[in-house]
C-alpha cells in the first residue's frame, strides 16, 4: 500500500515529521517498508526555459533549442513532439545520470549539431511510462530551481506492508484513523456535500443471492464531460504509481485508494437496452429494487461459459462459479475484479453508471486466482469491504465527478441490500488483558483506546461490553481486542522480564535425537525441506477426513486454509513441481507437525523418494527406487532410536491411510502405539498431482517414539571375529499368505550365536510350484565368535532350520 504525506493530510491534521509518522505506523502494526523521497533522488534535475527553437538542418524530427539555465543559454537538441518555445522544462545538465538506463549525460554531437544537456520526459526519470513528450512545468517555476517542488514530487511516499486481516487500512482514511488513535494527529471529519438528484433511474436492479452480493448501489450521471482530471489528483495518483487516464477513471482510483471501496464506471451508452443488475445462483428467488422497469443487464453466475473481454485487453472464459455483470449483449464485468471492455469509459463518454458494491470475498478470491487476474479491486474485495461505508463512498465519488466534469444530471441512489448489522458484543475485562499480555490498564484507559479505534463500549462493573466497528472484519474474539489495545498502547511499553533458567530435560534429548535422524537421512542423499503447516482443504481431503476444528478462521489464502493432517502432501507437491522442471530423481525429508484435531498435534519425520537410485554412478546403470529402499532408510532411523523394525515392532497391515497403495504399504506399531507407516503412494494421489512415476514414503511419529535411555545415542561396539564366516543359500516353499518379513525375522532369531545376517535374494511363484505357494530364496551368514564352524556344525544348523521352518510355517526345502 502506497500513499503520500499530502494524501494523508487530507484526512489527518498532523504536524509530525516523516520519520515520526513512519515509526508510529510500524509501532501500530502497519510496517513501513520504505519511505521514498523523489525530491532527493531527483535533486540534480533543474528548471529550464526554452527561449526559442529552430529546425535541425539535418533531421526533420529534431529541433535546436536555445535553453535558458542558471548557467546561461545552452543549445540542446530535442526530438520530443511537444517541444516548443516559451515553456518551462526539466533539464539534465552534463554529468548527471538519467534514472532510466543509468545513462550519464555528456556533451554530444547529434547529426552534426552540438547538444549540451537533455530535456527530460517522465519515462526517463522513472516517474511513469509516459514517453510522449518532455515534462512541462508551471510558468511560475523559477529557472535553476530543483524541479520537483513544481511537479508535486516534494511529497514523501510511504510504502507499508498490510497484513491480510487489515483490509480496513487499504485506504488512506483507515491509516489516518489508526494514527489518530495512536495520538499522532487528529482525524478530520469527512465533508459530505448534499447531492441534488434530478431524476429517478429507470434501471432495474435484481439480486438473486445476498451471500454473493450483500450490497449493490449505483447512480446514473448524465451529460458529463470526461476531461483530464485536475493536477492535484493526477499528481497524487502518479506519485503512488497509478497511471492517470481521465476524470472518471482517476476519481474511481482515488476513492478506492482513499477509502478502500472499489468504484467502477460503466459507459451507459454502451449498455444495450439500458442496464439492470441481477445476482443469482440458478434460482428463481429474486430480491428486487422497486420502481424500476428496464431489465436488460444482469449480475449473475455465468452459466453459459461465455467469453468475457476485460478492460486489460484480455479475454477470459468464465464458468458458473464466476460472478458476472451482464447486459443483453453479454458480460460487462467480472464482479469485484475487473470491468469489461465493451462498456469501458473513454474521453467521449457523457453518460455513466457509477457502481459501488460489496461482493463475497471468497468468491472474488477464487475467481481471481483461477483466471490469474490481479487488480486493486480484487485485492480490496477479497479482504472484505466495509458495507456500511459503501453508499457514502459512492456519494463522495459522485460529488468529485460533479466538481470536475461540469454540470451533470444525477439520479437517486439505486440500491439492493442492506448495511451490515451491528456485531454481537464481547465481554472484555481488565483481568483478561493482564492475564494474556501482562499489561495493567484501567477500565477508562482501555475504553479510551477502543473508542478512538471506533469500537462501541459499555462498561458494566468490571466488564466492558465491546462491539467492533463495521470495518473491522477481523475482530471476533477477546484476544483480537487485546491485540488492538496493546498495539495502540505500545509494544515498547511492555516491561521485559528475565527468562527462566533452562534445564536439560527430555526436550533437549528429543532435539538431539531429531538432529541425529536428520544427519542419517542427509548421509543417505536426502535433502531436508521445510514447508508450511497449512494447506488447502481441497488437497487435505485426499489424505484425511476434514475436521471442522482444523479450518483456519483467518487464512492467509484459500490455499492455506487448513491445518495439515500429514506432511506428505507438501512433499508430494514438491515432487510434482520438480517433475514439471524435468527433475526426476528425488529424495526429501521434513520434520514437522501434523494435526489430528485441535487437541492432538504430533511431530513427524516424513521422507519421500521417487525416480532413480544412484543414477550418476559411472559404474552402474542405476535402478529405480522401490519399497525396500524406503524400508531400509526407516530401519536405520528406528535402530538409532534404540529399536529394531524386526525385533521390536509388530507389522500391521490393517487400516492403512487412504493415500497409501492398499497392498504395498504397512503400518508400524510398538505395542498399542502407532509409530507410522511406510510404502508406496496410491496411484489416485499421483494422478491428482499430475505425477507419472512411483513414489515411496515413510512417516514416523516421533511424538510416539519412546526415548530409550540405555540405547539412545549409543552404538554396540563393532568387533571383527577371528574366525571364518560361512554362507548358506536356502530356498523354501511356503504358502502365499505367509509374510516374507515374518519368516526372515524368525530366521534371524533362530540361532543368535551363529546367524549374523539374513538376505532375501529371490521370490518366485509360477507354474512350477503348486497353486497357492511361493518360493523364497535367502542367503544366511553363519559365524561363531569362539571357533571355526565345522561341516558337522553347518549340517546340524541346516537340519534344525529346515525342521523348524517346516513346523512353524509348513515350509519345505526346495530341491
Swiss-Prot record:
Domain FDX-ACB: 721-814
Principal location class: cytoplasm
UniProt cross-references to InterPro entries, sorted A to Z: aa-tRNA-synth_II/BPL/LPL (IPR045864), B3/B4_tRNA-bd (IPR005146), DNA-bd_dom_put_sf (IPR009061), Fdx_antiC-bd (IPR005121), Fdx_antiC-bd_sf (IPR036690), NA-bd_OB-fold (IPR012340), Phe-tRNA-ligase_IIc_bsu (IPR045060), Phe-tRNA-ligase_IIc_bsu_bact (IPR004532)
Cofactor: Mg(2+)
Cofactor: binding details: Binds 2 magnesium ions per tetramer.
Cellular component GO terms held in the UniProt record: phenylalanine-tRNA ligase complex
SUPFAM superfamilies tied to this protein: Anticodon-binding domain of PheRS, Class II aaRS and biotin synthetases, Nucleic acid-binding proteins, PheT/TilS domain, Putative DNA-binding domain
Pfam family for this entry, one: tRNA_bind
Top-level taxon of the source organism: Bacteria
Subcellular locations according to the entry: Cytoplasm
Alphabetically ordered keywords of this record: Aminoacyl-tRNA synthetase, ATP-binding, Cytoplasm, Ligase, Magnesium, Metal-binding, Nucleotide-binding, Protein biosynthesis, RNA-binding, tRNA-binding
B5 domain span: 421-496
GO MF, one annotated term: tRNA binding
Known EC number: 6.1.1.20
GO biological process: phenylalanyl-tRNA aminoacylation
Family of the protein in this entry: Belongs to the phenylalanyl-tRNA synthetase beta subunit family. Type 1 subfamily.
Subunit note: Tetramer of two alpha and two beta subunits.
Protein name listed in UniProt: Phenylalanine--tRNA ligase beta subunit
Amino acid at each position: 500500500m502506497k500513499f503520500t504525506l499530502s494524501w494523508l493530510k487530507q484526512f489527518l491534521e498532523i504536524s509530525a515529521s516523516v520519520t515520526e509518522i513512519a515509526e508510529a505506523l510500524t509501532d501500530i502494526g502497519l510496517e513501513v517498508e520504505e519511505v521514498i523521497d523523489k525530491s532527493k533522488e531527483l535533486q540534480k534535475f533543474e528548471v529550464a526555459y526554452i527561449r526559442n527553437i529552430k529546425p535541425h538542418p539535418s533531421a526533420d524530427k529534431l529541433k535546436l533549442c536555445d535553453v535558458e539555465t542558471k548557467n546561461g543559454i545552452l543549445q540542446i537538441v530535442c526530438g520530443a513532439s511537444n517541444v516548443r518555445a516559451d515553456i518551462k522544462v526539466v533539464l539534465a545538465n552534463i554529468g548527471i545520470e538519467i534514472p532510466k538506463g543509468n545513462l550519464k549525460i555528456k556533451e554530444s554531437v547529434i547529426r552534426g549539431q552540438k547538444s549540451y544537456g537533455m530535456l527530460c520526459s517522465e519515462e526517463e526519470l522513472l516517474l511513469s511510462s509516459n514517453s510522449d513528450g518532455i515534462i512541462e512545468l508551471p510558468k511560475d517555476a523559477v529557472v535553476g530551481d530543483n524541479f520537483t517542488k513544481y511537479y508535486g514530487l516534494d511529497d514523501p511516499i510511504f510504502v507499508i506492508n498490510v497484513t491480510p486481516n487489515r483490509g480496513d487500512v487499504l485506504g488512506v482514511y483507515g491509516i489516518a484513523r489508526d494514527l489518530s488513535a495512536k495520538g499522532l494527529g487528529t482525524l478530520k471529519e469527512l465533508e459530505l456535500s448534499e447531492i441534488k438528484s434530478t431524476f429517478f433511474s429507470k434501471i432495474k436492479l435484481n439480486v438473486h443471492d445476498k451471500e454473493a452480493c450483500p450490497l449493490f448501489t449505483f447512480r446514473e450521471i448524465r451529460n458529463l464531460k470526461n476531461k483530464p482530471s485536475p493536477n492535484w489528483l493526477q499528481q497524487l495518483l502518479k506519485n503512488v504509481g497509478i497511471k492517470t487516464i481521465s476524470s472518471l477513471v482517476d476519481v474511481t482510483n482515488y476513492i478506492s485508494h482513499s477509502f478502500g471501496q472499489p468504484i467502477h464506471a460503466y459507459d451507459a451508452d454502451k449498455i444495450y437496452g439500458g442496464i439492470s443488475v441481477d445476482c443469482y445462483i440458478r434460482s428463481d428467488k429474486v430480491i428486487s429494487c422497486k420502481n424500476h422497469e428496464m431489465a436488460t443487464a444482469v449480475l449473475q453466475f455465468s452459466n453459459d461459459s461465455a467469453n468475457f473481454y476485460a478492460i486489460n485487453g484480455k479475454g477470459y472464459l468464465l464458468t458458473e462459479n464466476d460472478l458476472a455483470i451482464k447486459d443483453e449483449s453479454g458480460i460487462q464485468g467480472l464482479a469485484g475484479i475487473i470491468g469489461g471492455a465493451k462498456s469501458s469509459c473513454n474521453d467521449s463518454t457523457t453518460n455513466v453508471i457509477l457502481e459501488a458494491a460489496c461482493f463475497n470475498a471468497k468468491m472474488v478470491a477464487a475467481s481471481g486466482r483461477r483466471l490469474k487476474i490481479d487488480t486493486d479491486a480484487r485485492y480490496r474485495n477479497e479482504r472484505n469491504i466495509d458495507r456500511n461505508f459503501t453508499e457514502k463512498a459512492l456519494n463522495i465519488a459522485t460529488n468529485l465527478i460533479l466538481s470536475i466534469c461540469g454540470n451533470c444530471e444525477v439520479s437517486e441512489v439505486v440500491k439492493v441490500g442492506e448495511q451490515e448489522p451491528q456485531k454481537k458484543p464481547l465481554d472484555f475485562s481488565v483481568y483478561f488483558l493482564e492475564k494474556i499480555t501482562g499489561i495493567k490498564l484501567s477500565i477508562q484507559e482501555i475504553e479510551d483506546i477502543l473508542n478512538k479505534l471506533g469500537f462501541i463500549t459499555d462498561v458494566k462493573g468490571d466488564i466492558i461490553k465491546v462491539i467492533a466497528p463495521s470495518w473491522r472484519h477481523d475482530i471476533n474474539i477477546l484476544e483480537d481486542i487485546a491485540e488492538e489495545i496493546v498495539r495502540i498502547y505500545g509494544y515498547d511499553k511492555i516491561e521485559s522480564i528475565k527468562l527462566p533458567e533452562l534445564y536439560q530435560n527430555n526436550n533437549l534429548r528429543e532435539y538431539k535425537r531429531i538432529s541425529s535422524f536428520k544427519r542419517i537421512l542427509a548421509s543417505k542423499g536426502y535433502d531436508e525441506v521445510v514447508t508450511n503447516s497449512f494447506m488447502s482443504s481441497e488437497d487435505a481431503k485426499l489424505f484425511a477426513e476434514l475436521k471442522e476444528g482444523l479450518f483456519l478462521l483467518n487464512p492467509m489464502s484459500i490455499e492455506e486454509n487448513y491445518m495439515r493432517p500429514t506432511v506428505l502432501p507438501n512433499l508430494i507437491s514438491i515432487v510434482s513441481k520438480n517433475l514439471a522442471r524435468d527433475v526426476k530423481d528425488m529424495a526429501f525429508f521434513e520434520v514437522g507437525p501434523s494435526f489430528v484435531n485441535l487437541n492432538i498435534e504430533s511431530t513427524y519425520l516424513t521422507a519421500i523418494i521417487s525416480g532413480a537410485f544412484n543414477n550418476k554412478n559411472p559404474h552402474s546403470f542405476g535402478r529405480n527406487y522401490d519399497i525396500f529402499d524406503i524400508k531400509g532408510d526407516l530401519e536405520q532411523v528406528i535402530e538409532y532410536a534404540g529399536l529394531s523394525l524386526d525385533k521390536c515392532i509388530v507389522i500391521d497391515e490393517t487400516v492403512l491411510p487412504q493415500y497409501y497403495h492398499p497392498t504395498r504399504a504397512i503400518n508400524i506399531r510398538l505395542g498399542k502405539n502407532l509409530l507410522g507407516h511406510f510404502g508406496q503412494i496410491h496411484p489416485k494421489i499421483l494422478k491428482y498431482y499430475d505425477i507419472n512415476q512411483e513414489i515411496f514414503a515413510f512417516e514416523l511419529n516421533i511424538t510416539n517414539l519412546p526415548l530409550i535411555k540405555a540405547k539412545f545415542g549409543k552404538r554396540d561396539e563393532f568387533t571383527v571375529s577371528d574366525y571364518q564366516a560361512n554362507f548358506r543359500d536356502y530356498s523354501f516353499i511356503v504358502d502365499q499368505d505367509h509374510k516374507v518379513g515374518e519368516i526372515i525375522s524368525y530366521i534371524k532369531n533362530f540361532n543368535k550365536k551363529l546367524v549374523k545376517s539374513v538376505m532375501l535374494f529371490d521370490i518366485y511363484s509360477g507354474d512350477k510350484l503348486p497353486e497357492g505357494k511361493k518360493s523364497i530364496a535367502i542367503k544366511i551368514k553363519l559365524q561363531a565368535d569362539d571357533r571355526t564352524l565345522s561341516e558337522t556344525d553347518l549340517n546340524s544348523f541346516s537340519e534344525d532350520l529346515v525342521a523348524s521352518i517346516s513346523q512353524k510355517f509348513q515350509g519345505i526345502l526346495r530341491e
